[in-house]
Amino acid sequence: MTAPSMDRSSQPHPGGAKGMRIVVTGATGNVGTSVVQALSEDPAVDSVLCLARRVPSWRPAKTTWQAADVEPGMADLVRLFDGTDAVIHLAWKFQPTHHPAETWRTNVLGSMRVFDAVAAAGVPTLVHASSVGAYSPGPKDRSVDESWPTHGWPQAAYTREKAYLERVLDTYEHAHPAVRVVRMRPGFLFKRESASEQRRIFAGRLLPGRLVRNTLIPAVPDLPGLRFQALHTDDAAAAYLAAVTRPVHGAFNLAADPVVDASVLAELFEARSFAIPAAPVRAALAAAWRLRLVPASPDLFDAVLRLPLMDSSRARKELAWDPVRTSVEALEEFLAGLRSGTGMATAPLAAGA
């Protein structure tokens, strides 16, 4: 859907020098809000056109907002992208997990519309939000670089869709060599303001935020394969900004130290960890998912236990990127937001207890 006109309530960047014009899809989500904020604060950026299905009251400097949906048959993306220096594509739908054809329509077909519109409008740079989830199952005892296969975990919709888009971009880059394509592959992204949204996406009503307290979590399960990487969303946004302003191309892994495992989680909750096979945990999750008590599917659980650990050396070197916060600090901030029901003034990030 498109609004009849763009909301230009934010003041343009002052000064006579012409800076970059950027379009951000999915501008109101966890990553989108951090990326838009980072762009709005950078002197190299003159204006940011923010696309979202629902226009928020949140208005950073230099931003113009447009209600737009990337799905087939919806917004005229070529018109919206015309005259732009770069498109950062972040729009993504996590639910409904019981109807993967619906998420496929938005995430895959919608992304393909974005890619095609970038080429048709003559936009020189496309920055796409890929993910660690695009990677094929990999090692947990060493890190892999961006050359690791990106076939995803085929049973989970999220990883299947992220991997499929990697293949789409492989073909796209051959067909459109004039477009500089950058693929960002972050680990799990957390910030205080995303806590309510992420609880709704992954845990639903089964996990009220007020229950995530140390006194109520005496132990953390130590599952085989439970080793993952995380980073603060604002640190990921800094990498997106660098990808726009630096003449780089290709894929970039993004992760902060340390690797998160059961011992790290146990320390966060001041609890003990205990070894348990994955099968009973998966069975309980599958039952809760079938009963629609939790939105996250057991297939996504399987995928998480198979994700490789990533080497972020390329991002640190070519993007001059160095995360400000550790993965533990990002998780601490997220958990604090979860307990307090923190959010932001956008529809996806709306606060909720």
Task: Please tell me what each predicted stretch does.
Residues 2-11, 15-16, 71, 272-275, ...:
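C-terminal amphipathic/interface module of NAD(P)-dependent oxidoreductases
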Residues 20-41:
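N-terminal Rossmann NAD(P)H-binding glycine-rich loop of SDR-like oxidoreductase domains
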Residues 57, 63, 68-109, 117:
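NAD(P)H-binding glycine-rich loop region in Rossmannoid oxidoreductase-like domains
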Residues 102-113, 160-161, 231:
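Glycine-rich NAD(P)-binding loop of the Rossmann-fold in SDR/ketoreductase-type enzymes
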Residues 109, 113-158:
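Conserved Rossmann-fold NAD(P)-dependent oxidoreductase catalytic core, especially the SDR/UDP-sugar
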Residues 141-185:
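Catalytic helix-loop patch of NAD(P)-dependent Rossmann-fold dehydrogenases
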Residues 172-228:
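NAD(P)-dependent short-chain dehydrogenase/reductase
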Residues 227, 235-296, 332-333, 341-353:
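Mid/C-terminal beta-alpha module of Rossmann-like enzyme folds, strongest
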